[in-house]
UniProtKB/Swiss-Prot annotation:
One of its GO terms (biological process) is carbohydrate metabolic process. This is 5-oxoprolinase subunit A. Catalyzes the cleavage of 5-oxoproline to form L-glutamate coupled to the hydrolysis of ATP to ADP and inorganic phosphate. It catalyses: 5-oxo-L-proline + ATP + 2 H2O = L-glutamate + ADP + phosphate + H(+). Keywords: ATP-binding, Hydrolase, Nucleotide-binding. Forms a complex composed of PxpA, PxpB and PxpC. Pfam families: LamB_YcsF. It comes from Cupriavidus metallidurans (strain ATCC 43123 / DSM 2839 / NBRC 102507 / CH34). Its EC number is 3.5.2.9. Transmembrane segments: none annotated. InterPro entries: Glyco_hydro/deAcase_b/a-brl (IPR011330), LamB/YcsF/PxpA-like (IPR005501). Belongs to the LamB/PxpA family. One of its GO terms (molecular function) is ATP binding.
Length: 246
């Protein structure tokens, strides 16, 4: 058995270089919610040095709120936003002799795509039109996966190590009780359950079937590095290899 470990990087959190030694896929901010050209380039160099699969992490144009504020934008504007950001990061990757592998929307753009089909279709169309060989990362069991597959893209169903789940398989909204698992042991056990047993316990105690192909580790917490090391060790002890597998 194998699993991909991904993290959102290039967001100015200071752990990037060390985290890249522990993960298999990096989602690099494209400057619209965090980072800038210099940060993007440096993160790309670190990722290539660690042989980590590189992906674009496009967002709404929302640096003030780290891309976590929902915006009502026309689908064509979102299409242009995403296309622009993918192209910017791809330029950095190509200049260093690498190859862009995937795209994962960020923050509110990701969460809205779970429930807004037209928004999701615009994101997926931008990915497909830029490069139909790119892999699309989306929330496991959600319409993001269905829409991307219908467009002919390869997908990876994403689960979250430290986020709470609703009974319908969506993530508990940030800022509400149960949204984040502060206890590392809870997050570790949840990850193992999703990867090995293909199920997750929702906040109401019910078990929800889930397909895990890539696990997101948040890189902006105070204990991000320690948790990444623990999760690698725990998965390794279960005989689960860490690989991007694109």
């Amino acid at each position: 058995m194998q699993i991909d470990l991904n993290a959102d990087l290039g967001e100015g959190c200071g752990n990037d270089e060390a985290l890249l030694a522990l993960i298999s896929s990096a989602n690099i901010a494209c400057g619209w919610h965090a980072g800038d050209a210099a940060t993007m380039l440096q993160t790309v160099k670190w990722a290539l040095a660690n042989k980590v699969s590189i992906g674009a992490h496009p967002s709404f144009p929302d640096r003030e709120n780290f891309g976590r504020t929902e915006m009502q934008r026309d689908p064509e504007a979102v299409y242009a936003d995403v296309l622009y950001q993918i192209g910017a990061l791809d330029a950095m990757v190509r200049a260093q002799g690498g190859e862009l592998a995937h795209v994962k929307p960020h923050g509110a753009l990701y969460n809205m795509a779970v429930r807004d089909a037209k928004l999701c279709e615009a994101i997926v169309r931008a990915v497909r039109d830029y490069d139909s060989d790119l892999v699309f990362f989306g929330l496991a069991n959600s319409q993001m996966i269905d829409i991307a597959r219908a467009a002919g893209l390869r997908v990876k169903e994403e689960v979250f190590a430290d986020r709470g789940y609703n009974p319908d398989g969506t993530l508990v909204k940030r800022g509400t009780p149960g949204a984040l698992h502060e206890d590392e042991d809870v997050a570790l056990n949840q990850t193992l359950s999703m990867v090995r047993d293909k199920q997750v316990r929702a906040i109401d105690g019910t078990w929800v079937p889930i397909r895990a192909e890539t696990v997101c580790l948040h890189g902006d917490g105070a204990h991000a590095l320690a948790f990444a090391r623990r999760i690698r060790e725990r998965l390794g002890a279960e005989g689960i290899a860490i690989r991007a597998g694109n």
